[in-house]
């Protein structure tokens, strides 16, 4: 069994010449992407679709972007990746629909042994990383090997994620901890205690209503949504 096979089976392996040979495709494609006219959005997206193992519709990547293999990265629809993202995809990295990455997001499926005597032999490992649907990852976040992030989670800027993150939570810190749960009451606010203005909120309600069956918009409890929307509208009426 060679080291590429060991890596793909989740075993420890050594990055020898055969392993580095497998990385050359990604290096050529990322070099191409990172040296393109940055206003050529569709051209960059076309290279990303060639680079990634699976790719949904309507994606946008702002170069520079770096990865090890590319083929181990799977992204869903409406993926937005801001500047200077690094994905060490020595194992599979799956990213769901409607995910947003701020600048300098780092996703590390790769790792090394704790003990230096083991580490210095050259053996390393890789563990899958799974990111659910509708996840927003803030700037300078680091996601470590083996982590799963649940749907609709928000990861605060500068966080170091070493453990699984539950769905519908806001998390932040080093190490990353739960700050609070996200509820449907949050639809009233866009930043801290800043509320959406009436025009913006009514436009969002229209978009939700017109797209109620396409699965893009998630709510924790749709049954309570009319009550929340009514309360927000009453606030507009009352000034």
Language model feature labels by segment:
Residues 38, 65-75, 80-148, 174-175, ...:
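Flexible, glycine/small-residue-enriched loop-and-beta-strand segment within the central core
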Residues 47, 63-64:
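Arg/Lys-rich RNA-binding interfaces used to dock onto structured RNA substrates
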Residues 1-58, 176-239:
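Terminal amphipathic alpha-helical/low-complexity segments used for targeting or macromolecular assembly
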Residues 165-167, 172-175:
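Acidic, glycine-centered active-site loop in nucleotide-sugar glycosyltransferases
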Residues 60, 130-132, 136, 154-156, ...:
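A generic "structured core" feature
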Residues 139-164:
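Beta-rich strand-turn-strand
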């Amino acid at each position: 069994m060679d080291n590429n096979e060991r890596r793909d089976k989740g075993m420890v392996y050594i990055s020898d010449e055969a392993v580095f040979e497998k990385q050359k495709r990604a290096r050529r494609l990322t070099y191409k992407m990172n040296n393109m006219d940055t206003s050529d959005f569709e051209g960059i997206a076309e290279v990303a679709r060639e680079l990634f193992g699976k790719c949904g519709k309507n994606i946008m990547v702002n170069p520079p972007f770096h990865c090890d293999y590319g083929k181990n990265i799977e992204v869903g629809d409406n993926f937005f990746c801001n500047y200077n993202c690094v994905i060490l995809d020595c194992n599979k990295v799956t990213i769901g629909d409607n995910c947003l990455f701020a600048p300098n997001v780092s996703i590390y499926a790769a790792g090394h042994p704790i003990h230096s005597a083991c580490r210095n032999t050259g053996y390393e490992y890789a563990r899958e990383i799974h990111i659910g649907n509708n996840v927003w990852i803030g700037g300078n976040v680091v996601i470590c090997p083996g982590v799963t992030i649940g749907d609709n989670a928000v990861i605060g800027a500068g966080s170091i994620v070493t453990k699984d993150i539950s769905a519908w939570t806001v998390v932040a810190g080093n190490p990353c901890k739960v700050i609070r749960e996200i509820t449907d009451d949050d639809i009233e606010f866009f930043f801290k205690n800043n509320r959406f203005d009436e025009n913006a909120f009514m436009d969002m309600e229209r978009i939700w209503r017109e797209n109620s069956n396409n699965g893009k918009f998630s709510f924790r409890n749709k049954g309570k949504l009319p009550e929340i929307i009514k309360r927000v509208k009453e606030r507009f009426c009352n000034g």
